[in-house]
Amino acid sequence: MARSNLNVSGIEIANDRPFVLFGGMNVLESRELAFEVAEKYVDVCTRLGIPYVFKASFDKANRSSVNSFRGPGLEKGLQILADIKSKFGVPIISDVHEPGQAAPAAEVCDIIQLPAFLSRQTDLVVAMAKTGAVINIKKAQFLAPQEMKHIITKCEEAGNDQIILCERGTSFGYNNLVVDMLGFGIMKQMNVPVFFDVTHALQMPGGRADSAGGRRAQVTDLALAGMSQGLAGLFLEAHPDPDKARCDGPCALRLSQLEPFLERVKAVDDLVKSFKPIDTA
């Protein structure tokens, strides 16, 4: 059975514990920018007392256009992530797109992420599970919350019970996503930590013809609504200049706004978890 409480490099991850931040940037645009972003997150999270895991992708294999920027690739990308881990002393999370990437990614990353579009790909799920790493499973835009139990079972059958589920929005017609707040409770009943990816929930897939649009202006509203559900953590991407970001800039928080944004998220999380649970069933 999957675990309701996980420990990643001394960080406790559970729905009833203070929230953990999976934060960073969408894709590794450059070594220098990655270090700048990591330093800002570490400084802010240290001041606010928020447990922190750095996130960035070494390869974005699911871009809308064949001409879209994908990142430095597996080898160079993992080296950058390893260097960030060493310099800042933080755990790392990054996503895996092919079974052959799972083992090398798990050697560097404390958490490996299963992309939403690929979450039903059994060979990929099994390869990731067999690494023994903690797995963050993004809920596919086309799956109901209750269907995530089948992906958990695949991981368990492959010998891995260290599983996190992450909500990132559900398809609502064309070029739009919505977040069903009731879905958080359904996934929490599966005895796993549940996170909210507020960044990608703001996407408008294909909304800019050859790339995704987004609704950055609503990031605070949606984040506070999601964290009111009593979650294990928040997934967030930020950028010094989102309008120049090479992937998902329309959804990214401005890096300069990170501290006031997280102050609000932490206040909601602290308040919600100060209440005693009540059974209304």
Curated annotation (Swiss-Prot):
Keyword Phosphoprotein in annotation: no
Sample GO molecular function, one term: 3-deoxy-8-phosphooctulonate synthase activity
Keyword Oxidoreductase on entry: no
Subcellular localization(s) per the UniProt record: Cytoplasm
InterPro entries listed in its UniProt record: Aldolase_TIM, DAHP1/KDSA, KDO8P_synthase
EC number: 2.5.1.55
GO BP field: keto-3-deoxy-D-manno-octulosonic acid biosynthetic process
A Pfam family matched in the record: DAHP_synth_1
Location (main, coarse): cytoplasm
UniProt xrefs under NCBIfam families: KDO8P_synth, PRK05198.1
The protein's name: 2-dehydro-3-deoxyphosphooctonate aldolase
Gene name tied to this protein: kdsA
